[in-house]
């Protein structure tokens, strides 16, 4: 089995004016495609790992051959992270129900959660991701470097938990529209969060 670039469930301009068409198209067809290609190349002679869903593969990086660990950490990680990211974007959804109640329980309020998430995203030095994760029965905000995922575990990524929501803070995700204004990009994210997808991920793991 080889990995393939997932189709987006919306047009490249569907998130305008918050996320621009040109960035979405380049991000998906160039950056994400490169992670897919590189992951497949690294897995060519590793059928026991190539057969795994990418979300499972990145939980088993300590089992892959040492000379493939870094390339798969970066590129299988990039494929997994972006696949989640695209599904987590949609205009017009509302935070409600069990996920909203859990956020209010664990952060005190939705505004407190957003402030903590924005801080994690804005202060991640260089490239990386901010995440809302479920750890056991508690929600938490974490961030990871590069294409690391909380699914990789603390020993590799410095974070753990099941991702409910993720935001890409690599410059390629926002530079064409926002240049160096990462905080502005982060603020716009709230206008395109697919809360239905986040709620479904939460319900599947709670």
Swiss-Prot record:
EC number in record: 1.15.1.1
Pfam families xref list: Sod_Fe_C, Sod_Fe_N
Q: How is the cofactor bound?
A: Binds 1 Mn(2+) ion per subunit.
* Cellular component GO terms held in the UniProt record: cytoplasm
User: PANTHER family annotated for this entry?
Assistant: 37S RIBOSOMAL PROTEIN S26, MITOCHONDRIAL, SMALL RIBOSOMAL SUBUNIT PROTEIN MS42
The task this protein performs is described as:
Destroys superoxide anion radicals which are normally produced within the cells and which are toxic to biological systems.
Subunit composition and interactions: Homodimer.
- Write the protein's name: Superoxide dismutase [Mn]
Organism of origin is: Salmonella typhimurium (strain LT2 / SGSC1412 / ATCC 700720)
Q: What is the lineage of its organism?
A: Bacteria, Pseudomonadati, Pseudomonadota, Gammaproteobacteria, Enterobacterales
């Amino acid at each position: 089995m080889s990995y393939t670039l997932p189709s987006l469930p919306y047009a490249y301009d569907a998130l305008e004016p918050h996320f621009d068409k040109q960035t979405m198209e380049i991000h998906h067809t160039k950056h994400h495609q490169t992670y897919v290609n590189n992951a497949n190349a690294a897995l060519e002679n590793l059928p026991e790992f190539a057969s795994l869903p990418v979300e499972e593969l990145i939980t088993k990086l300590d089992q892959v051959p040492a000379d493939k660990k870094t390339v798969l950490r970066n590129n299988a990680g990039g494929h997994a992270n972006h696949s989640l990211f695209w599904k987590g974007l949609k205009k017009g959804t509302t935070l409600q129900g069990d996920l909203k109640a859990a956020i209010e329980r664990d952060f005190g309020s939705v505004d407190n959660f957003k402030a903590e998430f924005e801080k994690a995203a804005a202060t991640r030095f260089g490239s990386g991701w901010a995440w809302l994760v479920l750890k056991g029965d508690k929600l938490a905000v974490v961030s990871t470097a590069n294409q690391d995922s909380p699914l990789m575990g603390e020993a590799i990524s410095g974070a753990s938990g099941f991702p409910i929501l993720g935001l890409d803070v690599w410059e390629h995700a926002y530079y064409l529209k926002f240049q160096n204004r990462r905080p502005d990009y982060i603020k716009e994210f709230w206008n395109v969060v697919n809360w239905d997808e986040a709620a479904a991920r939460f319900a599947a793991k709670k």
